[in-house]
Curated annotation (Swiss-Prot):
NCBIfam families on file: sufC
Protein's UniProt name: Vegetative protein 296
Record keyword Mitochondrion present: no
Family: Belongs to the ABC transporter superfamily. Ycf16 family.
Molecular functions per Gene Ontology: ATP binding; ATP hydrolysis activity
SUPFAM superfamilies, per the entry: P-loop containing nucleoside triphosphate hydrolases (SSF52540)
Lineage: Bacteria, Bacillati, Bacillota, Bacilli, Bacillales
Residues making up the signal peptide according to the UniProt record: none
Source organism per UniProt: Bacillus subtilis (strain 168)
Residues that coordinate or bind ATP: 38-45
Length: 261
Protein backbone atom coordinates (compact mmCIF):
# COMPACT_ATOMS: atom_id res chain seq x y z
CA UNK A 1 0.00 0.00 0.00
CA UNK A 2 1.48 3.31 -1.06
CA UNK A 3 1.70 6.08 1.52
CA UNK A 4 -1.09 8.64 1.33
CA UNK A 5 -0.82 12.42 1.04
CA UNK A 6 -3.29 14.98 2.39
CA UNK A 7 -2.81 18.31 0.62
CA UNK A 8 -4.44 21.56 1.75
CA UNK A 9 -4.02 24.55 -0.56
CA UNK A 10 -5.06 28.16 0.11
CA UNK A 11 -7.94 27.03 2.32
CA UNK A 12 -10.43 29.73 3.28
CA UNK A 13 -13.25 28.81 5.66
CA UNK A 14 -16.19 30.83 6.98
CA UNK A 15 -18.54 30.19 9.85
CA UNK A 16 -21.84 32.08 9.74
CA UNK A 17 -20.35 34.54 7.25
CA UNK A 18 -17.21 35.26 9.30
CA UNK A 19 -13.90 34.21 7.75
CA UNK A 20 -11.83 32.08 10.15
CA UNK A 21 -9.25 30.41 7.90
CA UNK A 22 -7.56 32.82 5.51
CA UNK A 23 -5.40 30.73 3.23
CA UNK A 24 -4.02 27.64 4.98
CA UNK A 25 -1.40 25.56 3.16
CA UNK A 26 -0.33 22.17 4.54
CA UNK A 27 0.83 18.82 3.20
CA UNK A 28 0.90 15.70 5.35
CA UNK A 29 2.33 12.46 3.97
CA UNK A 30 2.20 8.92 5.30
CA UNK A 31 5.04 8.41 7.77
CA UNK A 32 4.94 12.05 8.94
CA UNK A 33 3.71 13.48 12.23
CA UNK A 34 2.80 17.18 12.08
CA UNK A 35 1.80 19.42 15.00
CA UNK A 36 -0.29 22.58 14.63
CA UNK A 37 0.09 25.04 17.51
CA UNK A 38 -1.10 28.57 18.11
CA UNK A 39 -2.93 30.81 20.56
CA UNK A 40 -6.66 30.39 21.20
CA UNK A 41 -8.98 31.55 18.45
CA UNK A 42 -6.53 31.26 15.55
CA UNK A 43 -8.48 28.63 13.61
CA UNK A 44 -6.84 25.36 14.67
CA UNK A 45 -10.04 23.46 15.42
CA UNK A 46 -11.76 25.05 12.44
CA UNK A 47 -9.10 23.41 10.27
CA UNK A 48 -9.89 19.92 11.62
CA UNK A 49 -13.65 20.46 11.26
CA UNK A 50 -13.27 21.68 7.67
CA UNK A 51 -11.11 18.70 6.69
CA UNK A 52 -13.78 16.29 7.95
CA UNK A 53 -16.71 18.22 6.47
CA UNK A 54 -18.54 19.71 9.48
CA UNK A 55 -21.65 21.36 7.97
CA UNK A 56 -21.25 24.54 10.03
CA UNK A 57 -17.97 25.38 8.29
CA UNK A 58 -18.16 26.67 4.73
CA UNK A 59 -15.10 26.35 2.50
CA UNK A 60 -15.15 29.47 0.31
CA UNK A 61 -11.82 29.03 -1.47
CA UNK A 62 -8.97 26.56 -1.82
CA UNK A 63 -8.75 22.78 -1.98
CA UNK A 64 -8.28 19.67 0.14
CA UNK A 65 -7.16 16.50 -1.62
CA UNK A 66 -6.30 13.01 -0.40
CA UNK A 67 -4.09 11.19 -2.90
CA UNK A 68 -5.30 13.59 -5.58
CA UNK A 69 -9.00 12.98 -4.88
CA UNK A 70 -11.14 16.02 -4.04
CA UNK A 71 -12.07 15.70 -0.36
CA UNK A 72 -14.43 18.69 -0.53
CA UNK A 73 -16.66 16.76 -2.95
CA UNK A 74 -17.05 13.91 -0.45
CA UNK A 75 -19.72 13.50 2.22
CA UNK A 76 -18.47 13.04 5.80
CA UNK A 77 -18.79 9.24 5.69
CA UNK A 78 -17.00 9.15 2.33
CA UNK A 79 -14.09 11.07 3.85
CA UNK A 80 -13.85 8.46 6.58
CA UNK A 81 -14.05 5.61 4.05
CA UNK A 82 -11.31 7.28 1.99
CA UNK A 83 -9.00 7.02 5.00
CA UNK A 84 -9.40 10.22 7.03
CA UNK A 85 -9.99 10.08 10.80
CA UNK A 86 -10.76 12.78 13.36
CA UNK A 87 -10.24 12.30 17.10
CA UNK A 88 -12.36 15.04 18.61
CA UNK A 89 -11.78 17.21 21.64
CA UNK A 90 -15.32 16.45 22.87
CA UNK A 91 -16.48 13.06 21.50
CA UNK A 92 -20.23 12.44 21.30
CA UNK A 93 -22.07 9.96 23.50
CA UNK A 94 -24.18 7.44 21.57
CA UNK A 95 -26.68 5.48 23.63
CA UNK A 96 -27.73 2.01 22.46
CA UNK A 97 -24.57 1.32 20.44
CA UNK A 98 -21.82 -0.61 22.20
CA UNK A 99 -18.19 0.25 21.71
CA UNK A 100 -17.55 -3.15 20.12
CA UNK A 101 -20.46 -2.87 17.66
CA UNK A 102 -19.43 0.64 16.68
CA UNK A 103 -15.82 -0.36 16.04
CA UNK A 104 -16.69 -3.47 14.04
CA UNK A 105 -19.10 -1.45 11.88
CA UNK A 106 -16.48 1.28 11.39
CA UNK A 107 -13.85 -1.24 10.28
CA UNK A 108 -16.24 -3.01 7.89
CA UNK A 109 -17.49 0.27 6.41
CA UNK A 110 -14.02 0.72 4.91
CA UNK A 111 -13.90 -2.79 3.46
CA UNK A 112 -15.43 -4.32 0.36
CA UNK A 113 -18.50 -6.54 0.71
CA UNK A 114 -17.34 -10.08 1.39
CA UNK A 115 -14.09 -8.84 2.97
CA UNK A 116 -15.53 -8.03 6.41
CA UNK A 117 -13.33 -8.64 9.45
CA UNK A 118 -14.12 -11.99 11.09
CA UNK A 119 -15.55 -11.89 14.60
CA UNK A 120 -12.60 -13.84 16.06
CA UNK A 121 -10.03 -11.59 14.42
CA UNK A 122 -11.93 -8.50 15.56
CA UNK A 123 -12.18 -9.68 19.18
CA UNK A 124 -8.49 -10.58 19.26
CA UNK A 125 -7.48 -7.20 17.83
CA UNK A 126 -9.78 -5.32 20.19
CA UNK A 127 -8.56 -7.23 23.25
CA UNK A 128 -4.91 -6.59 22.34
CA UNK A 129 -5.44 -2.88 21.76
CA UNK A 130 -7.54 -2.37 24.89
CA UNK A 131 -4.87 -4.09 26.95
CA UNK A 132 -2.19 -1.90 25.33
CA UNK A 133 -4.20 1.22 26.27
CA UNK A 134 -4.78 -0.12 29.81
CA UNK A 135 -8.56 -0.05 29.32
CA UNK A 136 -11.06 -2.05 31.37
CA UNK A 137 -12.25 -4.97 29.17
CA UNK A 138 -15.84 -4.19 30.20
CA UNK A 139 -15.66 -0.95 28.19
CA UNK A 140 -16.10 -3.00 25.00
CA UNK A 141 -19.74 -3.64 25.93
CA UNK A 142 -20.54 -0.18 27.28
CA UNK A 143 -22.47 2.28 25.13
CA UNK A 144 -20.21 4.52 23.10
CA UNK A 145 -18.72 7.20 25.39
CA UNK A 146 -21.82 7.11 27.63
CA UNK A 147 -20.82 7.90 31.20
CA UNK A 148 -17.12 7.77 30.24
CA UNK A 149 -14.74 10.08 32.08
CA UNK A 150 -12.74 12.57 30.01
CA UNK A 151 -9.70 10.30 30.13
CA UNK A 152 -11.75 7.23 29.12
CA UNK A 153 -13.19 9.11 26.14
CA UNK A 154 -9.70 10.07 24.96
CA UNK A 155 -8.41 6.51 25.31
CA UNK A 156 -11.47 5.36 23.42
CA UNK A 157 -10.67 7.77 20.57
CA UNK A 158 -7.17 6.25 20.36
CA UNK A 159 -8.65 2.74 20.51
CA UNK A 160 -10.75 3.70 17.46
CA UNK A 161 -7.62 5.00 15.75
CA UNK A 162 -5.74 1.74 16.39
CA UNK A 163 -8.66 -0.44 15.31
CA UNK A 164 -9.63 1.47 12.16
CA UNK A 165 -6.05 2.18 11.00
CA UNK A 166 -6.79 5.24 8.83
CA UNK A 167 -4.37 6.70 6.28
CA UNK A 168 -4.34 10.18 7.84
CA UNK A 169 -5.53 11.06 11.37
CA UNK A 170 -6.34 14.50 12.73
CA UNK A 171 -6.10 14.64 16.51
CA UNK A 172 -7.85 17.76 17.81
CA UNK A 173 -6.49 18.64 21.27
CA UNK A 174 -6.37 14.98 22.24
CA UNK A 175 -4.26 16.03 25.25
CA UNK A 176 -6.73 18.50 26.76
CA UNK A 177 -7.92 17.56 30.24
CA UNK A 178 -5.64 14.53 30.58
CA UNK A 179 -3.54 13.87 33.65
CA UNK A 180 0.05 12.86 33.06
CA UNK A 181 -0.60 9.09 33.34
CA UNK A 182 -3.45 9.17 30.83
CA UNK A 183 -1.38 11.39 28.52
CA UNK A 184 1.43 8.82 28.55
CA UNK A 185 -0.97 5.99 27.65
CA UNK A 186 -2.66 7.99 24.87
CA UNK A 187 0.75 8.98 23.48
CA UNK A 188 1.89 5.36 23.59
CA UNK A 189 -1.11 4.40 21.44
CA UNK A 190 -0.45 7.16 18.91
CA UNK A 191 3.25 6.28 18.70
CA UNK A 192 2.35 2.63 18.06
CA UNK A 193 0.58 3.79 14.88
CA UNK A 194 3.79 5.21 13.40
CA UNK A 195 4.43 3.68 10.00
CA UNK A 196 5.04 4.86 6.45
CA UNK A 197 1.34 4.21 5.72
CA UNK A 198 0.06 6.50 8.48
CA UNK A 199 0.22 10.29 8.65
CA UNK A 200 -0.87 12.36 11.63
CA UNK A 201 -1.86 15.99 12.22
CA UNK A 202 -1.91 16.87 15.93
CA UNK A 203 -3.62 20.09 16.96
CA UNK A 204 -2.50 21.19 20.41
CA UNK A 205 -2.03 24.18 22.67
CA UNK A 206 0.77 22.66 24.65
CA UNK A 207 4.29 21.39 24.18
CA UNK A 208 3.39 18.76 26.82
CA UNK A 209 1.95 16.32 24.25
CA UNK A 210 5.02 16.76 22.07
CA UNK A 211 7.25 15.64 24.94
CA UNK A 212 5.83 12.16 24.31
CA UNK A 213 5.14 12.27 20.56
CA UNK A 214 7.98 13.85 18.62
CA UNK A 215 6.65 15.71 15.57
CA UNK A 216 8.54 15.84 12.28
CA UNK A 217 7.13 19.30 11.56
CA UNK A 218 5.61 21.97 13.81
CA UNK A 219 3.33 24.64 12.30
CA UNK A 220 2.22 27.83 14.04
CA UNK A 221 -1.20 29.25 13.19
CA UNK A 222 -2.09 32.90 13.68
CA UNK A 223 -4.77 35.04 12.06
CA UNK A 224 -6.22 32.01 10.28
CA UNK A 225 -3.01 31.06 8.48
CA UNK A 226 0.13 28.99 9.02
CA UNK A 227 2.70 31.71 9.70
CA UNK A 228 5.73 29.61 10.62
CA UNK A 229 6.89 25.99 10.30
CA UNK A 230 9.91 24.22 11.73
CA UNK A 231 11.10 21.08 13.49
CA UNK A 232 10.37 19.85 17.02
CA UNK A 233 12.64 22.57 18.40
CA UNK A 234 10.07 25.20 17.34
CA UNK A 235 7.55 23.74 19.82
CA UNK A 236 10.19 23.82 22.55
CA UNK A 237 10.89 27.48 21.86
CA UNK A 238 7.17 28.29 21.97
CA UNK A 239 6.91 26.55 25.34
CA UNK A 240 9.83 28.56 26.69
CA UNK A 241 9.08 31.96 25.13
CA UNK A 242 5.41 31.97 24.11
CA UNK A 243 4.20 33.48 20.82
CA UNK A 244 5.21 37.12 21.20
CA UNK A 245 8.52 36.69 19.35
CA UNK A 246 6.66 35.35 16.30
CA UNK A 247 4.22 38.26 16.39
CA UNK A 248 7.12 40.71 16.52
CA UNK A 249 8.97 38.89 13.75
CA UNK A 250 5.92 39.02 11.48
CA UNK A 251 4.49 42.35 12.63
CA UNK A 252 1.29 40.76 13.94
CA UNK A 253 -0.59 42.83 16.50
CA UNK A 254 -3.66 40.69 17.22
CA UNK A 255 -3.25 36.97 16.62
CA UNK A 256 -6.92 35.95 16.87
CA UNK A 257 -9.49 35.87 14.10
CA UNK A 258 -12.28 37.16 16.26
CA UNK A 259 -13.67 34.05 17.92
CA UNK A 260 -12.76 30.81 19.61
CA UNK A 261 -11.92 28.56 16.69
Amino acid sequence: MAASTLTIKDLHVEIEGKEILKGVNLEIKGGEFHAVMGPNGTGKSTLSAAIMGHPKYEVTKGSITLDGKDVLEMEVDERAQAGLFLAMQYPSEISGVTNADFLRSAINARREEGDEISLMKFIRKMDENMEFLEMDPEMAQRYLNEGFSGGEKKRNEILQLMMIEPKIAILDEIDSGLDIDALKVVSKGINKMRSENFGCLMITHYQRLLNYITPDVVHVMMQGRVVKSGGAELAQRLEAEGYDWIKQELGIEDETVGQEA
